[in-house]
Amino acid sequence: MNENRTFATPDAVPVRAVVLAAGLGSRLGEPSSRRPKPLTPVAGRPILAHTLGHLAGVGVQEVVLVVGHLREAVRELAGGEYAGMKIHYVVNPDPSTTNNLRSVRLAREFLDQDVFLLEGDVVFEPAVLERLAAAPEASAVAASRPLRPLAGTVVRADADGVLTDYVDDRRQAGAFDHPGALKTANLYLLREAFLRERFLPALEELDRRLAGQGYYDYAVSDGLAAGGHAWRVADISDLAWYEVDDPGDQRQADFRFSPPREQQRILESLHGGYWRYGVTDHALLYNVHFPPAEMMEILRSDFDAVLRNYPSAHAPLTELAATIAARRPEEVVLANGSSEIIKILARLRGNWTVPVPGFNEYENVVGAERVHRYQLDAPDFRLPVEDYAAFVRRSGVDTAVVVSPNNPTSVGVPLADLRRLADLVGPDVLLVIDESFVDFAPAPIASIGPFLDRHRNVLLLKSISKVYGVGGIRLGYAATADTELARTLRAELPIWDINGFAEEFLRVLPHFRRAFADSCRQMRQNTLALAEGLAALPGIRVVPPDANFVFVELTGGIRAPELAHELFRRFRILTKECSGKSMPGGDAYLRVSSRSRAENEVVVAAVAEIVGGPRGAATTEGAGRADG
């Protein structure tokens, strides 16, 4: 919450509030059939409980609740008195057929003095009320820089916060373009003179003319147009607030009003979508230098057609993927992310060997009873292929996994060793080589793709989403010279599991091969610089990276869960702590994905501030392997 608080003088704070709590909340889905919208829980408490607590905290003495849908549940929460405040109820008998203009009009007998007028689906921090009441004698509207595309009433103010423009939806015909405007938060302080002379007369006229179908914003707007009253905009852009209309809003509000550790837990449970939450994502793995601007413009130009039309089925899409994989279409399986193929393989195959620590998806989908874990040893976490092959044979499995470069260690397996391993495990073992990050790796680490014809027991897996920087469209493929295996995998896929945006990306991608190669080189340089910066900090050992992320061991007093939390709490940076990985002492390891040079420098500076002390000599024999 924000510490820059604006305190109201006691005589500027109304002693009465009107809270609109009659709405259906239908956009919240099934819960709205058994719970009124203002009782939607946010951070463990109903929105209305937050609101009533804040009102009591600023000295409000009585609250008028306009109720309608499931009104008895509201009465059960608020009762006749709440936190020392007298509670009155006004019933809107037709909440399903009228809008909030009618609800406010029904409460008109309580609009005879200064009041807070608040909507019951808005959760906010207490300082919002203080900021509304900061100017004695002036009515005020709380407004904020938009949290999402503008919708609803917007306002403008001069440098002193005086309201200069109030634009409700009646003045928003055509394209909604109001640069510099603030979005109202549906939280008001209305002074008695404005209510009596402007608002109530406008409210009566509008309700008569619109038969309850309008919004009270119209009465505010019409009253302002008549002039003669002081109005201010309480800019709450730096304060926490959220209007909860749908489940996505509820998740956002939960996040905003939870303590930092719970916020971190919420984000980690999402496994993506972090861009909506105002954090820098160094947890998931990206190529931030691809797609280039020209490619993005091409994709944007076809947006309408791609959105409205069905994508192609598998055959033409597989041909596109085969072009990228440099294989024949019958050797390629295209899926909605490589994880989809992993899950299919888990159903079709028997027992597996998996080097650990590794990509958890293999262990999770195969199941503990069918996984034989091969422990990679610190400090370098390299895969000794002869020993691993012997382990595979002893285990009697039919499927063996290698991730190169490995996730989370960022350590790759040289191509010659992969080919040797394919021979050593024998033709009866399917060797799954996941090379989703190989494009970022230096020689001698390289793709086995050109040699699949000589190793028919190899299934190559590749995440297009990760390497090409398009995590939002979910694409991955498998390639193998065993066309019967490829056919079996394709048969497990639905006819339309690839969406139109993914198809359009595949169609355009071959025109940008050079740009992709350049992006990988840039990511490689970014990652080496990140590794070098982290290695120069006290108490940190960096495993030389072969991928677009850095695996670090914490050798000082701080553990990875604590460091990850401090990075989030203090700097809004997400990283991946590895205590959940199958490895001894996982709480000493942190994975940091590489982004732009500037973002990586922020991470290094943040870690330096947390671990303490000036940057010293590197604690590893060089942070990165030389390319070449």
Curated annotation (Swiss-Prot):
The organism's place on the tree of life at top rank: Bacteria
UniProt keywords, alphabetically: Antibiotic biosynthesis, Decarboxylase, Lyase, Magnesium, Metal-binding, Multifunctional enzyme, Nucleotidyltransferase, Pyridoxal phosphate, Transferase
Similarity-based family: In the N-terminal section; belongs to the MobA family. In the C-terminal section; belongs to the class-I pyridoxal-phosphate-dependent aminotransferase family.
Region (MobA-like NTP transferase): 1-255
Catalytic activity: 2-amino-4-phosphonobutanoate + CTP = CMP-5'-(3-amino-3-carboxypropyl)phosphonate + diphosphate; CMP-5'-(3-amino-3-carboxypropyl)phosphonate + H(+) = CMP-5'-(3-aminopropyl)phosphonate + CO2
Function: Bifunctional cytidylyltransferase/decarboxylase involved in the biosynthesis of the phosphonate antibiotic FR-900098, a potent antimalarial agent that acts as an inhibitor of 1-deoxy-D-xylulose 5-phosphate reductoisomerase (DXR), the first enzyme in the nonmevalonate pathway for isoprenoid biosynthesis. Catalyzes the condensation of 2-amino-4-phosphonobutyrate (2APn) and CTP to form CMP-5'-2APn and then decarboxylates CMP-5'-2APn to yield CMP-5'-(3-aminopropyl)phosphonate (CMP-5'-3APn).
Cofactor field: Mg(2+); pyridoxal 5'-phosphate
Species lineage: Bacteria, Bacillati, Actinomycetota, Actinomycetes, Kitasatosporales
Disulfide pattern: none
Annotated EC: 2.7.7.-, 4.1.1.-
Entry protein name: CMP-5'-(3-aminopropyl)phosphonate synthase
Biological source species: Streptomyces rubellomurinus (strain ATCC 31215)
Annotated Pfam families: Aminotran_1_2, NTP_transf_3
Residue intervals passing through the bilayer: none
Region (Decarboxylase): 278-628
Pathway assigned in UniProt: Antibiotic biosynthesis
Positions of modified residues (N6-(pyridoxal phosphate)lysine): 466
GO biological process, one term: antibiotic biosynthetic process
Listed result of changing residue 37 to A: Strong decrease in nucleotide transferase activity
The keyword Transferase belongs to this UniProt entry's keyword annotation: yes
GO function term, MF aspect, one: metal ion binding
